[in-house]
C-alpha cells in the first residue's frame, strides 16, 4: 500500500503517543512541528516537549515556530512537499495558508465526540460534567476551531473512577486506531465525511491553576468530579493553616448535614477527612502536603490531627 509523507504537529504526551504510532507505521513522518521550549520548575530549566524528545530520538527534523505566520517557516514547510499534515494536541491555531499546503489536507485527532467539547480541554470537560461516554473524532481541519467535517469517530466509556490521566490513556489507544484507519481510507479515497451539527456545539473552557482551589459551596458530587478532572494537572487543593494541601482522591458520602457549616470538617479517621459541602459530604482519601509525596489519609491520622481538627471550617 502507498505510504503518505506526513508533517506531524503536536506537543504533549497525548500527541507523542500518536506520533510514535506513525513512526512505527508504514507511513513516513518527514517533519514535526511542536511548541517552543519552555522554562519550568524552581530552577527555570529549559524543558523539551514529549513530541520534541521523541522526534530527536528518531532523527526527525523539528520546527518550533513562535509564529506560524512567519514567511520563512511557511516557505520551508511548503518545500517539504508533504502529502498531509496530522495535528494532535498541538496547542496553536493553524493558519489557513498552512492548511492549504497539503494535497491530502490537514487532519486533527480530537479527544471528544464532536461537536460536544470543542476546544482545548475536552477530556477534563467530559469528566467535570459527568458524561458517561466520550471518544475520538478525526476531522478535516478548516480555519475554525474543531469545526471541520468528521472523517471518523470511536466511542469510549467513562467510568466513575476515571481521572483525566486514566481517560487520556484510554483515548490514546482508540485515537491511534482511528488515525491509522483514516490514513488508510485517505489513500483508498474511501473517507465518508459528516458535517457537524452546529446546534449541538458545546465549548470546553480553558483551565487555569486558580481553578483548582476547592470551593465547599459546590456539591460533593461536583467537587469529586473536579478532583478527577484536574488530575494530573493542575491538581485540586484546599487551604489549612496557610498550607496548600493537594487532593488526589476523594469520594462522595451521600449524607447531607444541614446542621453543619459548609466547609466544616465533620470527621477525621482512617477512612479519610469528611468535609461538609453545600450538598452531601466529600471524603478525602489521598492528599499531598507541600514538598511531600502523595499519601493515604490513614497514614497521617495522628501526625496531622491538628490540621484537621473536627469542627474546623476550611
Curated annotation (Swiss-Prot):
Classification via InterPro entries? Fmt (IPR005794), Formyl_trans_C (IPR005793), Formyl_trans_C_sf (IPR037022), Formyl_transf_N (IPR002376), Formyl_transf_N_sf (IPR036477), Formyl_transferase-like_C_sf (IPR011034), Met-tRNA-FMT_C (IPR044135), Met-tRNA-FMT_N (IPR041711)
Which is one GO molecular function term here? methionyl-tRNA formyltransferase activity
Keyword list (alphabetical) reads:
Protein biosynthesis, Transferase
Asked if the keyword Protein biosynthesis belongs to this entry, the reply reads: yes
EC number assigned by the record? 2.1.2.9
One GO CC annotation: cytosol
What catalytic activity is recorded?
L-methionyl-tRNA(fMet) + (6R)-10-formyltetrahydrofolate = N-formyl-L-methionyl-tRNA(fMet) + (6S)-5,6,7,8-tetrahydrofolate + H(+)
What pairs make up the disulfide bonds? none
Q: Which Pfam families match?
A: Formyl_trans_C, Formyl_trans_N
Q: Which residues bind (6S)-5,6,7,8-tetrahydrofolate?
A: 112-115
Q: What's this chain's function?
A: Attaches a formyl group to the free amino group of methionyl-tRNA(fMet). The formyl group appears to play a dual role in the initiator identity of N-formylmethionyl-tRNA by promoting its recognition by IF2 and preventing the misappropriation of this tRNA by the elongation apparatus.
Annotated family: Belongs to the Fmt family.
Query: What's this protein's name?
Result: Methionyl-tRNA formyltransferase
